[in-house]
């Protein structure tokens, strides 16, 4: 076990400590575009600490740029700045991105590369051997990184620095566990300015809207931490390298909040802690100290510590959202996960939190080691009984460092650890292509249940639909709407709704997605409950639906045989509710995905899409339903001899509507998007024309 020590005396401001090393600290991004969901607080603490000892820090927060510009910025820094040490932080899912950064830096700089963060604390030898930094800091960075810098500067032996991995005689070597920090209040406040908090706040408006959670009133939000690690040890959770659970004092936390208010003018705070407080007294103290600051805040808590008076006190002090760890509604699964809570406690916390008009964020996890069809049914019944329609389903992931990872290793389910960790670099890709079944359910049934649960998320959302009262398309990517919360009757008038959400600040729609299918979960600003705005109910999106449906209806009327792609599984329910596919003369179904080959869809057995199978369908019309791989499918059809006018492609309708005909054709050389079977794009559908007012969607308007 590492020891917790009191921090050494920090130099006073007038002592002007000198240090020769110049350090580039890099925070990788976990998203392809600019990312405001993450701010490098940990690296901000490290930077603030080493700067106190005279080291000059050059920051690079890659979250502020899209994928390509990040590396342009990195190249610029390496070219223009004198850099002696490159520090990189990250967690396991950043493995591939960190590898790319290291490989980018090596030929451009002689600087020593130091890797830190959660990624170094599990499978340390593999990470060092594969990514090949010069050093790895394991556990908390402030003390260990400072000791390493001072040793590098003095020419000392790195083997004397506890808490690192490095190469000794060409072989990975560990120096054992380093010291942890005894009193977090001894640390200087994190250097938020250095890593671009102003920029972080400026781009938050780009992500005000999302499919998962959309807020009609944008709020700039500052993330803070009040503790480190967690006193609990759930089987699926990763704490390696975090050490013992420790907390800043509430007084110090509130002083940090006050400093942020003064500096940035922001009054909304997200408390990043895995567990903000393990006892009520600490929560009460916090509420008492912030109640007059006129702030709003979000935190993560346990259901077993809540009571009604405490929740009302939190609400009065500005708490507007709580993230709870539900995970399951089955006591059997909760016990296996070592959650140390019961389903009854979850239900009670839900009722009390709603009574206090505080929003709830939580998830259900499928796939614990004791999960069975019976335990799954218990959780499904629990979800419905408590109307947890926005507590979405995902799957248990055996992250390195968790008990579940160890179990997967024991069962020989991870034959290649390197490949497994790399697969987690894209969590969505992992869940759909590489997911490990830790249960005793057959693999085919396990996957089938997972797909059904993801579909259930959509169905559940639609049980609490936005009550649309009026709407008007403002252009190709936005509409103005008036709607009512179905829970509390709060009315929002004139809300401007961007769709898809990535177009919030004029961004381009992501056509390589099931665009137009997912709706948006809107948070009511009054009761803090979510309601679901169906995509088809948004005026400018509804127009595209109408045009696509006219194309389908034209095919029905012509009685021409059609081939359909793909055999939809994800979003199956939404597609069949919002589009009328009945009456089509379906002759074949094609798909590229192995797990769908042989599946029954629209009365046909799905066959594999390739040049040969596509050529066999020439002479029929092709309907390409919402699909991430739509462009590959269309290219295969064209290469096989399909006439362009015989292809009706959902994603290309959105390209035509949102980007215009010219832009759509630019994106797809040789493709002429059509609306209506065999007919060119009608003038009334052009985004360059006036967008017509639409009537309320009668199906979504609640009867009086």
Q: Where do the protein language model's features map onto the residues?
A:
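Glycine-rich beta-alpha loop elements in corrinoid/cobalamin-binding modules
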Residues: 49-184, 394-401
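Conserved C-terminal portion of the radical SAM core fold
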Residues: 66, 85-89, 114, 261-272, ...
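Glycine- and acidic-residue-enriched helix-capping/strand-helix junction motifs
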Residues: 33-43
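C-terminal accessory regions of radical SAM enzymes
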Residues: 4-7, 15-17, 21-33, 163-168, ...
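Generic structural signal for well-ordered alpha-helices
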Residues: 43, 47, 74, 99-102, ...
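A short helix->loop->beta-strand "cap" motif at the edges of active sites that frequently abuts
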Residues: 107-112, 133, 295, 319, ...
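Radical SAM [4Fe-4S] cluster-binding motif and immediate context
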Residues: 191-360, 494-505, 511, 518-522
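Hydrophobic, well-ordered beta-alpha structural blocks that scaffold small-molecule cofactor pockets
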Residues: 487-489, 524-704
């Amino acid at each position: 076990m590492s020891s917790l020590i009191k921090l050494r005396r920090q130099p006073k401001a007038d002592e002007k400590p000198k240090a020769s090393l110049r350090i580039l600290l890099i925070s990788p991004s976990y998203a392809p575009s600019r990312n405001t969901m993450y701010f490098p607080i940990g690296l901000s603490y490290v930077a603030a600490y080493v700067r106190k000892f005279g080291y000059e820090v050059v920051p690079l927060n890659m979250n502020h740029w899209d994928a390509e510009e990040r590396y342009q910025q990195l190249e610029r820094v390496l070219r223009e700045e004198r850099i002696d040490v490159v520090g990189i932080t990250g967690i396991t899912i950043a493995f591939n991105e960190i590898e790319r950064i290291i490989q980018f830096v090596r030929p451009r700089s002689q600087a020593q590369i130091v890797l830190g963060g959660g990624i170094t604390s599990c499978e340390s030898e593999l990470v060092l051997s594969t990514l090949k930094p010069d050093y790895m800091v394991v556990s908390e960075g402030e003390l260990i990184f400072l000791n390493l810098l001072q040793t590098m500067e003095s020419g000392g032996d790195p083997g004397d620095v506890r808490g690192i991995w490095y190469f000794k005689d060409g072989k990975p070597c560990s120096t054992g566990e380093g010291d942890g920090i005894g009193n977090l209040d001894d640390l200087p406040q994190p250097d938020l300015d250095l890593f671009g908090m102003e920029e972080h706040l400026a781009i938050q408006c780009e992500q005000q809207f999302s499919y998962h959670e959309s807020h009609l009133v944008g709020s700039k939000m500052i993330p803070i931490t009040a503790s480190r690690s967690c006193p609990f040890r759930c089987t699926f959770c990763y704490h390696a390298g975090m050490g013992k659970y420790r907390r800043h004092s509430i007084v110090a936390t509130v002083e940090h909040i006050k400093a942020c208010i003064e500096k940035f003018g922001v009054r909304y705070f997200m408390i990043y802690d895995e567990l903000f407080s393990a006892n009520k007294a600490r929560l009460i103290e916090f509420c008492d100290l912030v109640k007059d600051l006129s702030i709003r805040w979000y935190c993560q808590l346990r259901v077993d510590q809540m009571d009604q008076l405490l929740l009302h006190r939190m609400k009065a002090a500005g708490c507007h959202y709580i993230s709870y760890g539900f995970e399951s509604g089955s006591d059997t699964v909760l016990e296996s996960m070592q959650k140390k809570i019961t389903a009854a406690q979850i239900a009670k916390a839900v009722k009390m939190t709603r009574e206090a008009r505080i929003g709830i964020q939580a998830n259900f996890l499928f796939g614990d080691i004791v999960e069975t069809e019976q335990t799954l049914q218990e959780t499904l019944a629990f979800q419905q009984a408590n109307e947890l329609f926005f507590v979405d389903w995902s799957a248990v992931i055996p992250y390195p460092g968790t008990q579940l990872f160890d179990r997967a290793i024991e069962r020989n389910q991870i034959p290649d650890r390197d490949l497994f960790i790399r697969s987690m670099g894209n969590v969505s890709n992992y869940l759909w292509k590489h997911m490990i079944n830790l249960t005793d359910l057959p693999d085919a049934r396990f996957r089938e249940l997972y797909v059904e649960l993801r579909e259930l998320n959509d169905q559940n959302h639609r049980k609490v639909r936005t009550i649309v009262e009026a709407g008007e398309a403002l252009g190709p990517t936005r509409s103005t709407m008036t709607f009512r919360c179905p829970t509390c009757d709060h009315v929002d008038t004139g809300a401007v709704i961007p769709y898809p959400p990535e177009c919030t600040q004029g961004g381009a729609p992501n056509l390589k997605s099931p665009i137009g299918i997912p709706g948006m979960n809107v948070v009511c600003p009054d009761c803090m409950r979510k309601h679901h705005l169906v995509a088809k109910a948004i005026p400018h999106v509804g127009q595209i639906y109408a045009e696509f449906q006219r194309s389908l209806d034209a095919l029905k009327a012509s009685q021409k045989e059609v081939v359909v792609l793909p055999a939809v599984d994800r979003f199956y329910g939404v597609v069949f509710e919002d589009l009328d596919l009945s009456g089509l003369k379906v002759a074949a179904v094609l798909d590229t995905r192995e797990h769908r080959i042989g599946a029954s869809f629209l009365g046909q057995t799905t066959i594999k899409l390739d040049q040969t199978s596509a050529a066999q369908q020439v002479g029929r019309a092709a309907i390409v339903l919402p699909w991430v791989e739509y462009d590959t499918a269309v290219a295969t059809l064209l290469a096989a001899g399909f006439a362009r006018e015989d292809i009706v492609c959902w994603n290309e309708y959105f390209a035509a509507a949102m980007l215009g005909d010219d832009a759509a054709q630019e994106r797809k050389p040789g493709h002429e998007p059509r609306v209506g079977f065999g007919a060119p794009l009608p003038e009334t559908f052009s985004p360059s024309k006036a967008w017509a007012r639409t009537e309320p969607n009668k199906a979504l308007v609640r009867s009086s």
